[in-house]
Amino acid sequence: MRQRSQSPGSAYFYYPRLVCVIGARDDEKATANFAPVTWATPLSCEPPLFGACVSPSTRTHHLVLKTGEFTLSFLGMAEASLVDTLGRLSGSQVDKVKALELVLEPGEVATTPSLAAAYARAECILVDRHQCGDQTLLVGELQRVRVAAEAYDVQGVLRLDRISPLLYLGGNRYVTTDPTSESRPESRGDR
Amino acid sequence: MRQRSQSPGSAYFYYPRLVCVIGARDDEKATANFAPVTWATPLSCEPPLFGACVSPSTRTHHLVLKTGEFTLSFLGMAEASLVDTLGRLSGSQVDKVKALELVLEPGEVATTPSLAAAYARAECILVDRHQCGDQTLLVGELQRVRVAAEAYDVQGVLRLDRISPLLYLGGNRYVTTDPTSESRPESRGDR
């Protein structure tokens, strides 16, 4: 394979990545703010922790630190345009809920809403944060997960024949999975 | 959308996720160890940081802390079986390089090799670590990124018509992207 070597930062080599939308309660403006994040990952099984990178300059960062909680909303490919818009607007300047007529779901445990359009939603309590270069890794403990009843199979695996998860590819482009490519490999050495 | 509420941990709601294989030098055994990780994320642009969750009980954890460096290898869908096997074998018990006849690429900056089969590889120096529940988030500063010359377009975006990135879906299942689904949405409110 012909290769090229390059400095870090010049390629989106770590994409595609699943998009999740972080929700934060904005008491001051009597609304909530929603921002798409792809630099995010589960961090622990026990306790169940999930981390999301947020720039300290954002309204989301300010709100999560203030309220001590956040929600995660996972959306399908059909919501690419909405997600893109959420990423372009600033919660400091615009009430995104109002401007985009977002339909919200109230929290069951937390008091921060999530997006009704999501096929999976989680409520998190902020339990820790780590400064990582120019971002803050917000560490949330998962309190409750709500999923569309038809979205997952009995093993808890996403049904790609029913849900087309939204993945970010870099450069303002989005993509989803190919359900026909799904495979359960036979490990080398399996008999 | 009919919903069900559930305790965290009972659904793979945060999948699919891009697979990356962490490489660590094993001086003691004069080999290297490779383990697939999906709980991983970029953490910062400047400096360029990448974080990967590793259980403290693993050989990878031991080796990365000892050597202070690790590599990342991103593989295509065709390597699902290899990745699955790398995840099943323990580096404490087996020399995976030997057992699986892995072809390695030496590092350019670090001295830890990566997998030659990868379409993208990165070399990281361990700069920090955070205990997150039952995992350690290893924080690496990206030193060098090497990519297959044909894998990315001029904007640095992965060419899905050429590369089928390997995504983990949970439950021992893998999937890749659908290149025909790629879109660059027009933001709501764009004129």
Feature names for model-found ranges:
Chain A
Residues 1-191:
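Basic, polyanion-binding surface patches
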